[in-house]
């Protein structure tokens, strides 16, 4: 093998060994054994919510183990691959180089995953998107962002559960709430929190003028029973109404949609995508619990910031700009990471932004 190839493989081995140490593969195997034992308990499904959490944790742990084991196998096979390729000729060597580049990207992604060590990072993600300034274009932009995150989830074989979509009168969404279910989706997507800005020629403007639109993205961890988020029923006002679709048209003949108002905090949650009022209420309660957990965490952070004399991060500020006209560029304003292919980004190709955001957050935390 060429000395440069040997040096690169040695560097990849060092990085992967660090990942294996951080993940603690043997502890992960023990955790899987423990969860499999719980999952085999005949009485597990007496508590369906707890059972779903156990099976979800087991699935996440198994996926993480498979991923890191597969990386080790691929890396260990690289010297053999190069040995065979050098016997076959330049085309085979080029294929080996391509596999090495792919492996390098995958190990880098695993390295980023090891940076997700927060208390809730391994949870599923609950995403709220709200259209901001920009009228009909902003509503359309909110819907484009929702599609972007769902496409990202699909590319990673993650599950998506839509709780609520509030459509605007002409086009697009006023707001949307949905969960992305997969290992570390909250930790990964939490760097998406903030204001997203779109600049383009408006498809809704007969004069073809350029329009700037804004949408706010909120990312929360999905609440589990261990979080002990208690909600007093007397603190909740429940309103029911008919589900509506695009243009405000009713899509249900019964009052199945649910709106919950948490009176002490003023938090309002709606859910209309389930088939029954009961299902919508259960889903709305999950979202409300996630929002109350976020309030609790925010209060705790404020107390810590006060002790440290730290003003804290302002996630409400603009964090990414998507320019479709007069040039094409998507740029993260925190990390400076940018690409000139907005179409791919809006189709869910956001891993580069996520990895850069996670590295940036770790750097910020270390310097705080």
Swiss-Prot record:
The keyword Glycosyltransferase does not apply. One of its GO terms (cellular component) is cytoplasm. It comes from the Bacteria. Gene3D superfamilies: 3.30.160.20, 3.30.70.1660, Release factor. GO terms for molecular function: translation release factor activity, codon specific. Disulfide bonds: none annotated. InterPro entries: PCRF, Pep_chain_release_fac_I, Pep_chain_release_fac_I_sf, PrfB. Methylated by PrmC. Methylation increases the termination efficiency of RF2. Keywords: Cytoplasm, Methylation, Protein biosynthesis. The modification N5-methylglutamine is found at residue 249. It is found in: Cytoplasm. PROSITE patterns: RF_PROK_I (PS00745). Belongs to the prokaryotic/mitochondrial release factor family. Peptide chain release factor 2 directs the termination of translation in response to the peptide chain termination codons UGA and UAA. PANTHER family: CLASS I PEPTIDE CHAIN RELEASE FACTOR, PEPTIDE CHAIN RELEASE FACTOR 2. This is Peptide chain release factor 2. It comes from Rhodococcus erythropolis (strain PR4 / NBRC 100887). The gene is prfB.
């Amino acid at each position: 093998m060429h000395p440069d190839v040997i040096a690169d493989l040695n560097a990849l081995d060092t990085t992967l060994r660090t990942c294996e140490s951080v993940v603690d593969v043997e502890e992960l195997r023990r955790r899987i054994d423990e969860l499999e034992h719980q999952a085999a308990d005949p009485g597990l499904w007496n508590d369906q919510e707890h059972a779903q959490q156990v099976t979800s944790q087991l699935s996440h742990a198994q996926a993480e183990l498979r991923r890191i084991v597969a990386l080790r196998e691929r890396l260990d096979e690289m010297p053999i691959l190069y040995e065979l390729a050098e016997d076959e000729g330049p085309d085979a060597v080029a294929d080996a180089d391509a596999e090495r580049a792919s492996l390098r990207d995958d190990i880098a992604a695993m390295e980023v995953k090891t940076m997700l060590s927060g208390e809730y990072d391994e949870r599923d993600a609950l995403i709220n998107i709200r259209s901001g300034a920009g009228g009909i274009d902003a509503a359309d932009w909110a819907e484009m962002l929702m599609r972007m995150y769902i496409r990202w989830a699909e590319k990673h074989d993650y599950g998506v559960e839509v709780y609520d979509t509030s459509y605007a009168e002409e086009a697009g969404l006023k707001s949307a709430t949905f969960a992305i279910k997969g290992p570390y989706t909250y930790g990964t997507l939490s760097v998406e929190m903030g204001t997203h800005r779109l600049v383009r020629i408006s498809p809704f403007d007969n004069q073809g003028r350029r329009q700037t639109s804004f949408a706010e993205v909120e990312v929360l961890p999905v609440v589990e029973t261990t979080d002990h988020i208690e909600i007093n029923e007397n603190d909740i006002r429940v309103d029911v109404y008919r589900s509506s679709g695009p243009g405000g048209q009713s899509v249900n003949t019964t009052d199945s949609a649910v709106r919950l108002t948490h009176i002490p905090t003023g938090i309002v949650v709606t859910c209309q995508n389930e088939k029954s009022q009961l299902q919508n209420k259960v889903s709305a309660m999950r979202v409300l619990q996630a929002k109350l957990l976020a309030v609790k965490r925010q209060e705790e952070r404020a107390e810590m910031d006060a002790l440290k004399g730290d003003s804290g991060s302002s996630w409400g500020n603009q964090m990414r700009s998507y320019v479709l006209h007069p040039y094409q560029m998507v740029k993260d304003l925190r990390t400076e990471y940018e690409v000139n292919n907005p179409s791919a980004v809006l189709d869910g190709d956001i891993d580069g932004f996520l990895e850069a955001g996670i590295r940036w957050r770790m750097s910020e935390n270390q310097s705080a």
